[in-house]
């Protein structure tokens, strides 16, 4: 009789636990749904810190298959918007590792390039004009190659048009940086260095406005070195580009 009572009590406890677990799962699901809708509204209203708080709550609930990819994507976007680039990058790496074939992986790669553009702008605006030649546009270069790869790998992405605009901006940014270095060499009468840097600019950024200015400094450098034939050829190229 005692054994039967023990089994009966165990069955009641087991059923109670099963019901409790089911109710807890349902509660978490309802809570996560509520928080997810709330954070979507917060993102729309640009309340990014509130959105991050709610998204992290959902993530910490460890809900199985509850829009985990969307939660991570929204977190990446929110961290990017509040300029928490390190955390955004960390989440990007986690996303790429977990969802390498995701339908919206192009969005993740595009945001990654935007983070590097933002990091470059942050550094660029903190550098005095006289010190620009000393700065290293590492993030601009990184973003440039990321976007080139992006445009090649995802030609049909909805972000391609913006990516091409960003590439145009980066070409201008990097060509002007190189031109600043070239000017520094010129004013210090390092004419060979001017010519070498000029050739690099013309090779990398031939379609930019910096290319014409580069030719002018190269022409002056060849004249200073008394290499008149080459200076004359460059002068003709400059005139042709004015037409």
Curated annotation (Swiss-Prot):
One of its GO terms (cellular component) is cell outer membrane. Residues 1-21 form the signal peptide. It holds the Pfam family YfiO. It comes from the Bacteria. Keywords: Cell outer membrane, Membrane, Signal. Its main location: membrane. One of its GO terms (biological process) is Gram-negative-bacterium-type cell outer membrane assembly. The keyword Iron does not apply. The keyword Signal applies. Part of the outer membrane protein assembly complex, which is involved in assembly and insertion of beta-barrel proteins into the outer membrane. Belongs to the BamD family. This is Outer membrane protein assembly factor BamD.
